[in-house]
From Swiss-Prot:
Chain sites annotated for binding substrate: S127, A171, C172, G200, N376, P377, C378, S379, E380, P561, T562, G563, T564, I565
Stated role: Catalyzes the reduction of ribonucleotides to deoxyribonucleotides. May function to provide a pool of deoxyribonucleotide precursors for DNA repair during oxygen limitation and/or for immediate growth after restoration of oxygen.
Record-linked InterPro entries: RdRp_reductase_class-2 (IPR050862), RNR_2_N (IPR013678), RNR_lg_C (IPR000788), RNR_NrdJ/NrdZ (IPR013344)
Family: Belongs to the ribonucleoside diphosphate reductase class-2 family.
Taxonomy of the source species: Bacteria, Pseudomonadati, Bdellovibrionota, Bdellovibrionia, Bdellovibrionales
GO MF annotation terms: cobalamin binding; cobalt ion binding; nucleotide binding; ribonucleoside-diphosphate reductase activity, thioredoxin disulfide as acceptor
Protein's name according to its UniProt entry: Vitamin B12-dependent ribonucleotide reductase
Keywords for this protein: Cobalamin, Cobalt, Disulfide bond, DNA synthesis, Nucleotide-binding, Oxidoreductase
GO biological process: DNA biosynthetic process
Length: 764
């Protein structure tokens, strides 16, 4: 039977029009200043769509525009150029690969639709696509390469010669590491290659022998922590994408490793050392002498816990720590003691996070190949070792129409278009090792996701912490994943399923049925009529097509932190996070900023049917008080709609439980996991953190990290004032600062994001 090709319909752009002609354009000057008021970045006469904010344009120009080798101007000067080079590269690669489009006309229609989506800020690819894609095609950019890519003619993985002809486009990598010097330092090399081109990577280091075990020559092993310190220093020396952000990495250790207690305490202990040095007069900057002196500051740390361990904690039973090579029990300690060390460290410095091993592998589509051991730096991508995932995120707010209704049809079209583009990127891209390249080609995992959920809910007048809010989140996530997997099955019909599908077909179809059964958890009655039936029919199609054709991609969706690309899309909130504050700072043309009320507040008041004069009075009150509590004309029953992740003392704030419940509403419909910070007040106790971790486990969340207000003492920090020693823990109070421009950062979705220059730390 002749294979089919994908149909690419016109939707946003019709009648032979160019997508650029559907936008009004403007020219602005970009200027970013550091905390001293000095110009940090400057570019004159930058062209962008009229609807883009000054901040979004600043992000595009400073982070994503090509800065060298562009004919005539020397650097890119327009959002039009940036989007054009990326889209042309993707479509040209699709034509070379074959099987995606029946004709050049179909390919041209797809290119127009994708351009419109990107220019209208309905969606965006992960940062490495903007950094690297299209630079060879548009500007003949060259850089020596030690990467590997799929060769369509030779039907095998081949070494590449030019880093930009087959660019690195995936943000997320998971790499294996074995118990040998060669493997450990091979990892150091591949990590450096990934960081250089703007990606992040994670590894599970549990195979490495502990300091309590012998080497092959009869001596004692150096131990896990000693090697982690070496790799940490390497990451600290590299900025991803040249100058865009620091290296992002994840370190995972299993709960039965003999050095797990040292690992749990590692970052906390090192930060205490740094603070003693700072108190003695050394610089508090992240790149200052104090933080350069200590280790453990350049990664997110997570402990991999099993159901057996969690039950041992509940039942107050002992826990066994086992030798890596022999499996011999080296030590037996109360499970509760290990657990208390985890919650204590998280209380003091927000690390380590927790990954729930059995929950993760319960939803694994390819267990016949191997189990899932680790994740990327922000914990949203969880798949096989030595694999990669390119991300794209949809801006949910862009699908609210003038009446406040959600445009499901255009959302579906956007999700499908982005997903096809992501699939094309798999074999367009290169990878740091031959094994990662082979697994990427053979399994083709993708990470479609969304941003701005918190803003969407507020604008609709729906409380984040409500059954209706969780119903919206679950419905939109199930719809997005259903579209992605249905599209994947259509691509499998056209080009064949992923190479590892046959071995894993039963397991993958089982997981698809689990996703479908989870639809029964959504409170559909709280949503617009007909959505329930439409989503259920969609998933019937996913199962029918999957059984008939298989799937082109082993994974389809994640919820990423959308750190920098969230700013590019003018998102008020990232990932599934709630709004951070009712007050925002708006950047002005030519520099500077003004304080404004979050735009979602007025939209919410309109959705709740407040009159114009009532809305204006409430907005004025919010501007002066950063709260709706006590505002004139405010109805008490509407107050939960305006609850945020943080608040001034005594004001309304979302509970930590509400964060976990939102994660649980979304998790059953995601291939991977969710990058999310559970915000907790400064008054939270270790017992409170323990309760949140247990709640996440019991609700089926795959991974969780907490942030107790004022606790974080790693990453880019600066003293806000003369240190006040906290008597109980012996460390000073600090305020987060951007390592690039020095502005205050915001912790969101597990990442520190600078709203001034767009720098992110820990995000990919």
């Amino acid at each position: 039977m002749k294979k089919q090709t994908l149909h690419s319909p016109s939707y946003f752009v019709s009648g032979g029009k160019n997508p650029e002609s559907l936008f009004a354009w403007k020219n602005v000057n970009c200027e970013i200043r550091n905390r001293k008021g000095e110009v940090f970045f400057e570019m004159k006469n930058v062209e962008a769509p009229e609807g883009w904010s000054q901040l979004a344009i600043d992000i595009a120009a400073s982070k994503y525009f090509r800065k060298v080798g562009v004919p005539k101007t020397g650097h890119e000067t327009s959002v039009r150029q940036m989007v054009d080079r990326v889209v042309k590269a993707i479509v040209a690669s699709a034509i070379r690969q074959g099987g995606y489009f029946a004709t050049r006309k179909e390919a041209d229609i797809f290119a127009k639709e994708l351009k419109f989506i990107l220019l209208s800020q309905r969606g965006a690819f992960n940062s490495p696509v903007w950094f690297n894609a299209g630079l060879w095609e548009a500007y003949k950019a060259q850089s020596p390469s030690e990467h590997f890519a799929w060769d369509e003619k030779k039907k095998s993985i081949q070494a590449t010669k030019n880093a930009y002809e087959r660019p690195q486009c995936s943000a997320c990598f998971i790499q294996s590491v074995d118990d040998s010097i060669e493997s450990i330092f091979d990892l150091a090399k591949t990590e450096a290659k990934l960081f250089k081109y703007g990606s992040g990577t994670g590894s599970n280091f549990s195979k490495i022998r502990s300091k309590y075990e012998a080497t092959g020559s009869g001596g004692k092993s150096s131990g896990l922590i000693s090697f982690l310190e070496v790799l940490d220093k390497g990451a600290g020396a590299i900025k991803s994408g040249g100058t865009t952000r620091r290296a992002a990495k994840m370190v995972v250790v299993d709960i039965d490793h003999p050095e797990v207690l040292d690992f749990i305490d590692w970052k906390m202990r090192e930060e205490q050392k740094a603070h003693l040095l700072i108190a003695a007069g050394l610089s508090a900057d992240f790149e200052g002498e104090a933080y350069r002196t200590v280790s453990g500051q350049n990664a997110n740390n997570s402990v991999r816990v099993s159901d057996a361990f969690m039950k041992a904690v509940e039942q107050e039973r002992p826990w066994k720590l086992k030798a890596r090579l022999t499996g011999k029990v080296l030590r037996e300690i109360p499970a509760g003691e290990v657990w208390n060390r985890i919650t204590r460290a998280a209380w003091m410095c927000a690390d380590p996070g927790i990954q729930f091993h059995d929950t993760i592998n319960k939803w694994h589509t390819c267990p016949e190949t191997d189990i899932i051991h680790s994740s990327n730096p922000c914990s949203e991508y969880m798949f096989l070792d030595d694999s990669a995932c390119n991300l794209a995120s949809i801006n949910l707010v862009k699908f609210l129409n003038d009446t406040g209704d959600f445009d499901f049809e255009s959302f579906i079209h956007t999700a499908r278009t982005l997903f096809v583009a992501q699939e094309i990127l798999v074999d367009y891209s290169s990878y740091p090792t031959q094994r990662v390249a082979q697994n990427s080609h053979d399994y083709r995992p993708l990470g479609l996701g969304f941003a701005n959920l918190g803003s969407l809910l507020m604008r609709k007048g729906v409380a984040y912490d409500s059954d209706e809010g969780r119903a919206w989140a679950g419905a939109l996530t199930s719809l997005m994943s259903g579209v992605a997997y249905l599209t994947s099955s259509e691509m499998a019909r056209a080009k064949g399923p992923f190479a590892g599908y046959r071995k894993n077909s039963k397991s993958m179809l089982k997981v698809m049925k689990m996703h479908e059964r989870a639809l029964n958890q959504v409170a559909w009655k709280m949503l617009p009529a007909g959505i329930d039936k439409a989503v259920r029919n969609l998933w019937k199609g996913v199962l029918y097509n999957g059984e008939k054709y298989g799937y082109r991609n082993a994974q389809a969706t994640v919820i990423a932190p959308t750190g920098t690309i969230g700013l590019l899309m003018d998102c008020d909130t990232t990932g599934i996070e709630p709004d951070f504050s009712l007050i925002k700072f708006k950047k002005l043309v030519g520099g500077g900023e003004i304080q404004i009320v979050n735009q979602s507040v007025d939209a919410a008041l309109a959705s709740l049917q407040y009159f114009e004069d009532e809305r204006q009075a409430i907005l004025k009150y919010v501007e002066e008080n950063n709260s709706v509590v006590g505002a004139p004309q405010m109805h008490p029953e509407d107050l939960p709609v305006f609850d945020t992740a943080t608040a001034m003392p005594g004001q309304r704030v979302l509970s930590p439980e509400s964060h976990v419940k939102m994660m649980a509403a979304v998790q059953p419909f995601i291939s991977g996991a969710i990058s999310k910070t559970v915000n907790m007040p400064s008054t939270a106790t270790e017992e409170d953190i323990s309760r949140i971790y247990f709640l996440a486990w019991k609700l089926g969340v795959k991974a969780v990290a907490v942030y107790r207000d004022g606790s974080k003492q790693s990453q880019p920090l600066n003293l806000k004032e003369k240190p006040k020693v906290v008597e109980e823990v012996g460390v000073p109070n600090f305020t987060m600062k951007c390592p690039e421009c020095g502005s205050d950062t915001v912790l969101t979705s597990g990442c520190y994001r600078c709203p001034n220059c767009g720098t992110t730390v820990g995000c990919s």
